[in-house]
Amino acid sequence: MVHARRHETRKNSKTQVPEQKSRVDWRRTKRSVSQLFDSDEELDSDEEIGSDEDLDGGESIDSDGKLDISKDSGINEIPEKETELNLIKVESERSNSKCHMNTSSSSADEEEMNKTKHNDLPDDEAHPGQAEGHHNKLTGQVLEEDVEDECIKPGKRKRLSSVMYDSDESDDSDILVRKASAKHPRRVVEDECSSLEMERETPEKSPAARKREYHQKLQELCERSRQKQRHNSGRNCESSEKDSCSSTDEDEDDDDYGDAENEDDYMIDDFVVGDEEADEENKNQGENLTTSQLKLVKQNSLYSFSDHYTHFERVVKALLINAFDGSFLETLYAGKRKKSYAQDMLTSLHYLDDRFIQPRLESLVSRSRWREQYKERVESYSDLSIHWKSPENCGCQACGLHRYCKFSVRLSGKLYNTRTMETDDFMSRDKQVFIVGRICAERTKIYHKLKHFKFKLYQDCCSIAYTKEVGDEQVKDTVKRLFCQLKKSGWIRKKHGQLEEYLNSADYFQDEKFKL
């Protein structure tokens, strides 16, 4: 009865073990472990009670000798009791060890414990001598694995840029750990170094900058002095040619010039002089401008800041004066005229020849294959007439190329001087005829108009001067009156428009790209 009851109790205790839960659900795992502890405690209490009864019953049977047991049955009962005692000891040790274990142990260890519980009973009954050692090994492994799990702690991420103490992470260590980034001290050191370098470089660069500023200001002063000298030299020339000049104006000019020199000296004194010799050389360069250099500057059209129409008006006025006084242009180009208005006219004449007409003529010739003889003929004769004729398959007399020539070019007129506009009566009735192609005829027309434009303009001025009544008035007054009339009537503007048209036609002329 006792054995059957004990067997039923162990069997019931097995069935009360809950099923294994998933390893992911930690709450269910903890709950199953707690239930397992309760069932093991009940089982231990029942087994202790049963073992006491078995011991009492065995003693009574042995002492009284009331029961007759065979040898075989006695042999079988002894090992059963021994195994039961061993199981009770092992389970009591297991319960004590589990009570001290952490409830947060891994589910894998609990599965191994459950498997050993299910497999322990038949193994113990078949091999009673090995049960105790086997259970001791299992409990030792479980304890070691639990201790290892308790010691393992996940690491914490620490910021590099922050400065903190690590006393909270480890209770045992009292060492203060400083963790700081190296960017901030570098940044401060670089700033200090850069500031020191800048302070060192600034005194080194300051003398060079001062020298540059000093030379720039000296150049400006030289330019101012040159302009003033030009202005004063022009005034002096005009005053020398005039019959009478007021002394008050001269005094004012002298005062102004003296004040300007004083201002220049005052500005130069404020400079930090590095080399006195260089300063003297710069001053001498500004003061040693001769009249010949000033003449070249005025004659050069690059130094003229007037517009095209202003230059053209001066040219018309110069041609009008030469129409009344034939020696004006000759003396002007010879440098005998020193007045400012005469120098302005000379500058405008150079500007018309060197800047307006000559570059276009060179461009037209450079893009053609004209013979030198044909070019000289076109430049020498002032009159041109182009006529259409029946085409001939022959060589062009202008460029020498073989093509269909259907234009006849006739050159005539007197030879003249391009500067003084004086004509030459030698072979005045001579004529030249050339048979050319279409492209050469167009090029000849444009080239001749530009080359002889100033001479044609002079002829028009002469015709106007001859038709107008002069009377007893002076040449200067007559030229002024005629110039005002031509300007009001729009004649000067019209001639300027013709010049612009010729210049544009020369710029946009297409050479031998046209098909015949």
Swiss-Prot record:
Residues 204-232 form a coiled coil. Residues 98-107 have a biased composition (Polar residues). Residues 38-62, 248-265 have a biased composition (Acidic residues). Residues 1-265 are annotated as: Disordered. Residues 1-13 have a biased composition (Basic residues). The modification Phosphothreonine is found at T202. GO terms for cellular component: nucleus. Residues 78-96, 113-135, 215-226 have a biased composition (Basic and acidic residues). It comes from the Eukaryota. Keywords: Coiled coil, Phosphoprotein. The modification Phosphoserine is found at S170, S194, S301. This is Coiled-coil domain-containing protein 82. It comes from Rattus norvegicus (Rat).
